[in-house]
């Protein structure tokens, strides 16, 4: 039995790990895990200092006893002549601790926080990698239903079972891939490197046709003035038809495919066949012009009768799923397709109707290999199919482009589903805006402006400022707390005053304010917008300095200030949110060169390692 030794006379907690049969009770201790909400960080298990990692065990020499804590129920404990030993299961719950037993079974590691406290490695760069977002994996979060084949950005089911576009999630997806792209360029790695890419389909002999008279496939090869070497395909549109196909490279690292095609009819489709390494399961991923009953990915159905349709079971070691491709490109026009099959297969396998939260499938490079790429219907394909390791530039472009195309007249990206807070004491109807979404969106767009050298991104970023000047009660994101302005992640009435969303909005405003040197000196309109961003940022920082102490509990931080208006208990921040507060506060402190903010962040780091504010 894992126990913790309580030395009241020394005010310290020591660990006692028992041996023998009691060791089998190890299953009672599980490491606390908490997936962070998609608007914040994904953090790894904390590393404690080397001096604190190992706590030597002493011989038990104790007898079983009965203990009562805070007038609660009695529990089994142990005592010897000097000390009393409490079960970790009790201490974990009572003191919000966590821990784990080492692999060798002789060492127990105790944590106050399950989240690692990070500080920025360098001064914040408005055009550089976005913090440690490069370690994110937005597309594998359990609330992400798919990366849409229509728009190439993630769709969420966090607050509604029907997939929808959540602006914060989309921006984080873009910032994740931008950060990876920048770090790859720093380390002289390029996703476009010829040595990493494999080009297929150039040779006409690589294009195979379906066998059997009932599956005839016509392939006509010619040179197109615009696209060069192409193949015109005419094949049966049924998904059961193999169509015209090309065998793909077997390397498990090359899980991203890219090609150009022009479909002529709505029944045109393409399919990637992948093989799982673990069980040799064959997975068919079809991309079709179908709405899918509101789903972005679904398992193919089998018609038993006119009134009875069921999902196709796993048959002969093979399953089939489809992604909705409607809206990606008009029929009869050329478009470029780029898909990461590692993501698409994982999202498909996680998409069953009876899926539970813990059924989320996450695949890693090496877990599958691509077998073939096939086409059906009437279409033309360029004879250049590219396989590569990553798609960072494309994913970043997709996110930035989505922001430009989906920005409304007020400069915002609205959330199309209801959001309820505090047991529905605060409710935001569909169509609400978020200051965090505005800030994240600006951070994506300013980087896209520099990376792609396209002013449409700069104009969109400038347009996003409008909602920062509109009150929450009027559909904007501007709130007020004791005379201090606040940019609301959730613009409820009364306000909720979420800390992390406010800090992210400040970073977005700062990003735009730093583009002055990149703007034409004769562009007075845009220069005025840059100045406006600076003023909004400065006003927010002034409020931060005034209100920040309200978020400090002396042992952790508070997520928001909803309790002030609602008269409820404070909403304490989980340790992963606490880690976000620390990181963002360090960013702002570095930008402002503010010693008070920096020391506050340092104090908050101490809370994660068991330090507490002094008593009176």
UniProtKB/Swiss-Prot annotation:
GO terms for cellular component: basement membrane; extracellular region; Golgi apparatus; plasma membrane. The keyword Nucleus does not apply. Pathway: Glycan metabolism; heparan sulfate biosynthesis; Glycan metabolism; heparin biosynthesis. It is a single-pass type II membrane protein. The keyword Isomerase applies. It is an enzyme of class 5 (isomerase). Residues 1-12 are cytoplasmic. Keywords: Basement membrane, Cell membrane, Extracellular matrix, Glycoprotein, Isomerase, Membrane, Secreted, Signal-anchor, Transmembrane, Transmembrane helix. Its EC number is 5.1.3.17. InterPro entries: C5-epim_C (IPR010598), C5-epimerase (IPR039721). The chain crosses the membrane at residues 13-29. The record marks 136, 143, 559, 577 as: Critical for catalysis. Pfam families: C5-epim_C, Glce_b_sandwich. It is found in: Cell membrane; Secreted, Extracellular space, Extracellular matrix, Basement membrane. It comes from the Eukaryota. Disruption phenotype: Irregular positioning of the AQR and PQR neurons in larva at the L4 stage. Substrate binds at residues 136, 141-143, 169, 504, 562, 574-580. Changing residue 610 to E: In ot16; midline crossover defects of PVQL and PVQR axons. Residues 30-616 are extracellular. Glycans are attached at residues 188, 232, 267, 471. Expression in comma stage embryos is strong in the hypodermis and intestine and weaker in the head region. In late embryos, larval, and adult stages, expressed primarily in hypodermis and intestine. One of its GO terms (biological process) is regulation of cell migration. Homodimer. Converts D-glucuronic acid residues adjacent to N-sulfate sugar residues to L-iduronic acids. Plays a role in the early migration of AQR and PQR neurons, which descend from the Q neuroblasts. Belongs to the D-glucuronyl C5-epimerase family. This is D-glucuronyl C5-epimerase. It comes from Caenorhabditis elegans.
């Amino acid at each position: 039995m894992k126990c913790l030794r309580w030395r009241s006379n020394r005010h310290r907690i020591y660990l006692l790990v028992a041996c023998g049969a009691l060791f089998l009770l190890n299953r009672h201790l599980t490491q606390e895990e908490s997936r962070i909400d998609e608007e914040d960080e994904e953090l790894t298990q904390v590393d404690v200092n080397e001096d604190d990692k190992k706590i030597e065990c002493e011989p038990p020499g104790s007898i079983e006893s009965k203990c009562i804590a805070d007038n609660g129920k009695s529990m089994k404990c142990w005592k010897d002549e000097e000390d009393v030993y409490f079960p970790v299961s009790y201490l974990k719950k009572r003191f919000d601790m966590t821990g784990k037993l080492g692999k060798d079974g002789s060492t127990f590691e105790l944590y106050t926080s399950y989240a690692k406290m990070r500080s920025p490695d360098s001064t914040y760069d408005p055009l550089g990698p976005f913090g440690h977002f490069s370690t994110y994996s937005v597309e594998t979060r359990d609330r992400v239903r798919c990366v849409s084949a229509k728009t190439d950005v993630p769709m969420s089911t966090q607050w509604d079972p029907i997939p929808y576009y959540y602006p914060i999630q989309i921006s984080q997806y873009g910032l994740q891939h931008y950060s990876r792209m920048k770090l790859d360029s720093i380390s002289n790695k390029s996703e476009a490197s010829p040595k990493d890419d494999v080009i297929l389909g150039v040779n006409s002999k690589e294009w195979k046709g379906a066998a059997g008279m009932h599956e005839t496939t016509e392939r006509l090869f010619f040179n197109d003035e615009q696209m060069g070497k192409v193949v015109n395909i005419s094949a049966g549109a049924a998904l059961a038809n193999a169509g015209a196909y090309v065998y793909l490279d077997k390397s498990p690292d090359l899980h991203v495919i890219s090609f150009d095609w022009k479909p002529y009819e709505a029944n045109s489709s393409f399919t990637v066949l992948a093989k799982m390494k673990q069980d040799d399961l064959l997975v068919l991923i079809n991309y079709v012009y179908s709405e899918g009953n509101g789903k972005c990915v679904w398992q193919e159905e089998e018609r038993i009768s006119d009134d009875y349709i069921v999902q196709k079971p796993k048959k002969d070691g093979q399953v089939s799923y489809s992604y909705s491709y409607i809206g990606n490109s008009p029929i009869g026009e050329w478009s470029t397709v780029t898909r990461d099959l590692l993501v698409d297969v994982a999202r498909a396998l996680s998409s069953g109707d009876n899926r539970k939260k813990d059924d989320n499938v996450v695949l890693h490079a090496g877990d599958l290999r691509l077998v073939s790429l096939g086409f059906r219907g009437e279409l033309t394909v360029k004879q250049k199919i590219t396989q590569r390791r990553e798609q960072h530039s494309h994913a970043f472009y997709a996110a930035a482009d989505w922001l430009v195309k989906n920005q409304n007249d007020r400069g915002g990206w609205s959330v199309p589903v209801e959001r309820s807070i505090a047991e529905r004491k605060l409710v935001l109807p569909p169509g609400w805006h978020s200051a965090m979404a505005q800030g994240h969106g600006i951070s994506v767009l300013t980087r896209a402006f520099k990376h792609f050298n396209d002013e449409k991104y700069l104009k969109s970023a400038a347009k996003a400022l409008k909602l920062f000047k509109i009150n929450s009660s009027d559909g904007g994101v501007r709130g007020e707390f004791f005379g201090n302005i606040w940019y609301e992640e959730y613009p409820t009435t009364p306000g909720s005053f979420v800390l992390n969303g406010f800090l992210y909005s400040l970073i977005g405003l700062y990003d735009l304010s730093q583009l002055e040197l990149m703007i034409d000196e004769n562009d007075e309109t845009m220069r005025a917008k840059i100045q406006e961003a600076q003023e909004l940022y400065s006003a927010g920082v002034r409020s931060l300095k005034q209100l920040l102490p309200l978020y400090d509990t002396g042992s952790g931080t508070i997520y928001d200030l909803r309790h002030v208006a609602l008269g409820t208990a404070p909403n304490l921040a989980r340790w992963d949110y606490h880690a976000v507060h620390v990181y963002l506060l360090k960013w702002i402190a570095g930008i402002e060169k503010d010693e008070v903010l920096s020391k506050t962040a340092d104090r908050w780091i101490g809370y994660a390692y068991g330090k507490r504010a002094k008593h009176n």
